[in-house]
Amino acid sequence: MTNYPSIFNDVIGPVMRGPSSSHCAASLRIARICRDLMDEQIKDILIEFDPNGSLATTHKSQGSDMGLFGGFLGWEAFDERLQDSEQYLATAGINYSIKICELAEKHPNTYQITLTNDKEKRTLVAISTGGGMIEVINIDGNKVSMAGDYFETLIYCTDATSIINYLEATILFDEITFHQGVHSFIEIKSQNIIPENICNEIKQMPTVTFIKAINPVLPIMARKNLKVPFITCNEMMEYNKDKNKSLWELAVDYESIRGNISPALVMDKMKAIIQIMRNAIETGLKGTNYKDRILGSQSPQYKETFEANQLIGGDVINKTIMYVSAIMEVKSSMGVIVAAPTAGSCGGLPGVVFGTADSIHKNED
């Protein structure tokens, strides 16, 4: 199925804590899918990284471990407990081990995860594709493609024909695929979770062993026959020929159509993100503390110097520098930021936008 970028999935986000969206937020999303795959009952976890990939030497320092542990516990990427997630994992009675070994999948950001409890053992392979985005590429030896933007139902079975016939006549779905292997299952992508009464009927079928329900982890879902009003600058200008809309209005149109949500909801989501960005600026300017970073808090001193008119003139530039620094210091102290879409540059977009807007006295609307 054709997919297109979403502003909230791919650009303005994720909302998170930690040094890297492609490590912290992505690993947390992968682990939340793992949690659903195990019906939230996890006892032991084996996490494997390839020695030639990027994660073998960075999984701890860049926050992959932290994100994984939080995801296994069902947390959000902005949960205030994340920096202590390893201790919370132990308290929950979940054991883990990390192994560096050669993997079949050669993508540099590959996670191979084996999960067990008293009843079952499942294996999942996923990759972090950047900016907090992910793709699950293998479950129990079967090739799949899950981006975390659908409700996914996996029906493990020995024969699929009668089950698929029943599903096609009974439920609304976007795609049904049968993955045949040692652990065969039917994968259903849909806009909503399959109703419990239908799942109960399916469980009674003789060829069905069990069913797994996996929730979406992205803020904006995909769908069958997805359309967008434009995808290039030329298409945007053509779309706007008879509308005369400003860029922000075109962005609202795009995300509303892309996400199948109302323009009002697009605005509400963006206002919530704006508030998080503003809070990060204010928090950073008050001063932040964190033991494990090279430089301490410098934004408050910059603010004092700015307010005392001791900087070379240039209100927009000086405010932008101050705001970017404040947000980056919040990021490095494990505060909540909007990655937009990388945590390593999370101060850039809001720093410039808010620095300019505040300098020319524009409100947040």
Language model: regions and residue ranges:
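Glycine/serine-rich anion-binding loops at beta->alpha junctions
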Residues: 14-27, 332-354
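Generic N-terminal targeting/processing segments that precede catalytic cores or assembly contacts
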Residues: 2-135, 140-331
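Phosphate/pyrophosphate-binding betaalpha-module
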Residues: 349-365
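Alpha-helix capping at helix-to-loop junctions
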Residues: 326-333, 358, 362
